[in-house]
Amino acid sequence: MYKQIVLATALLAGSMNMQAQSDINIGKSKIQLQSKLMTPEALWAMGRIGGAQASPNGKQIVYQVGYYSVKENKGHQVLYIMDSNGKNVRQLTTSAKNETDASWIEGGKRIAYLFEGQVWSMNPDGTERKQLTKSTTDIEGYKFSPDGKHIILIKSLPYHGSIKENPSDLPKATGRLVTDMNYRHWDHYVESIQHPFIADVTENGITDGVDILANEPYECPLAPFGGIEQLAWSKDSQCIAYTCRKKEGVEYAISTDSDIYLYNIGTRETKNLCKPADYKEPAIDPTKTMKTQAVNSEENLKNNPGYDVNPKFSPDGKYIAWLSMARNGYESDRNRLCVYTIETGEKTYITESFDSNVDDFCWNSDSKSIYFLGIWHGCENLYKATLKGNVVQLTDGWHDFGSVQLLNDGKHLLAERHDMAQAPELYIITPDKKEKSSKADQITFENKHLYDQMTFGKIEQRWTKTTDGKDLMYWIVLPSNFDPNKKYPTLLFCEGGPQSPVSQFWSYRWNFQIMAANGYVVIAPNRRGLPGFGSEWNEQISGDWTGQCMNDYLSAIDDAAANLPYVDKDRLGAVGASFGGFSVYYLAGHHDKRFKCFIAHDGAFNLESMYTDTEEAWFSNWEYEDAYWNKDLTENARKTYENSPHKFVDKWDTPILCIHGEKDYRINANQGMGAFNAARMRGIPAELLIFPDENHWVLKPQNGILWQRTFFNWLDRWLK
């Protein structure tokens, strides 16, 4: 279930459970490893960098780091400041409670930040802290206007669009009367939604503000992952561009049609920049595939019926750029850069020649080009697109860049970067006119003290042919103390999404280096359905979950077993989460005894149940196509339901570990429980690790360590 927020996922997953606070000031770990091998405890000892902001003069950078205590089972966000060359690093945080979302104000004289649900400010040296807001409702995000006279405040409001409010005389009643869809989202019941408020900044502080969406039952930013990046100030501080999907109930659950709106703070008038004023959306049948409905007709595609998010004004104020997907209901459609000319209303898509996703971007200082991050062949690099649509790749290498911004000198960019052997760190990029030649200098070394104690597995890349004659790339991760003369147990890694790239990602759970440290070779294929290999490759999977993508998995592991002498073909396992978990459940009935064990995390097991269980109904509508009860199913829908993993349990013959979070409303926990129960009824060795308090991810430190220990205990039991 690929989202626009791919680049921010690691930071989000690492910080979401930091809300619970204690008086213990959790800081940088001084853990000493007992061996040169990575452990679960070492993973949780790592600082997690994010939220970097360069000062207006480009000379300093403020950023935040998340630290965790396994003992306390909590995390803590800390603010740091440093020179833009990486020198003079200083910790600004003094509280045991989170201080986050730092930004520069007053021309760089002060730093604003969030603390205990309010906006505060301080000097760049951390002195003279001052509370700026006194909101009765927690502030969850903010953004000052360029002139410093106004501020956007993100607050949550009660919402009863899908869940009725209980009678006032039953204050202890816990039941929820649901009247429409969108009553649950990701990991929570939808009983509040976020709204943006525009407040004035005065000498006496910040006013309460005006709700941009007053009396409108819509959220902004978009749940569950959207943040302040979905709103932007105009250069003259008079307008705000914001992202919103103005739908409720079934319409919300079935549609990905978010738009960019322009709000004038003086007149309080709002204009939809994506659609004409007289636009009327074609009727949608939620039980039929959106692929062939009128909403996705060639004529209606001119009205931006897909995702439109993350607006950014050009420095000269003439344009607004945003990320845009063409089709409604297709959350993994190609992310393009749309440039809107404010004077004429003309929209231009400037990355059409780049046949992959744009994941983040920033304007160049001349307003004539845009820097963007894009995935290609398993790596996320920096590109530049002119307003005329000319695209050039600036950086190259086996890594993933993320969260890019231009420094005020117009000559350097600040970005995060990570790879399979390094967690995210900050880099300064110096663009070069020559293709793939831009220099990137590392300026933070947050976890060097831990890396210096570890031996990491080598990363390699290999290409092989698929069953239909295409070229398939897969990553190979070798064991930490690799001996080419030995044979090793080997894991086939099945990616989720189903359209998320197997890039040079770093995960604090699905971490390839901890697999290497435990003596496993990892085979990680960029199978059919993944971005970075062209639209045809990416889109082939929709409606064909059990076809060519599964053949690609088997092509990769068969190639490795046949041609890599260190791969022990008699000790193979398959592991994966989400769509990767679905893949494991399917392969369990179709692997012809290749594998000796399986691990499936939060995977779909019964696709008929999944069609109506998942809360984002657009996903199953697009991927499975028609509702399973329809008598005139499309051919893809028929194949999808006929090949659901639960229909092949009679062919299961291999030990399987099922893992699931009970707060996972994307793929409900009954999917994992059903798979485990089926295996045990058939007498197959199986275990179920269930987390009552985790969602699609595992976010709490002790749960994370339990996950890792269970994961490797299971693999070691059957593969060593």
Where are these regions (language model features)?
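N-terminal cap/lid segment of alpha/beta-hydrolase-fold proteins
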Residues: F445-N485
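Short beta-strand element of the alpha/beta-hydrolase
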Residues: L478, K486-G496
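Short loop/turn segments that connect beta-strands within beta-propeller blades
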Residues: D83-K87, N123-T127, V201-N204, N264-R268, ...
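Predominantly five- to eight-bladed beta-propeller fold
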Residues: S22-G27, H76-Q77, L153-N215, T243-K246, ...
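Conserved beta-propeller blade repeats
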Residues: M46-I61, A96-A112, R129, T136-I151, ...
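Active-site-proximal cap/loop segments of hydrolase catalytic domains
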Residues: N511, A516, A524-K720
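The serine-hydrolase catalytic nucleophile loop
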Residues: K487, P498-F512, R527, N670-Q671
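Short glycine/acidic-enriched loop and turn motifs that connect beta-strands
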Residues: Y67-K71, P158-G161, K247-V250, A326-Y330, ...
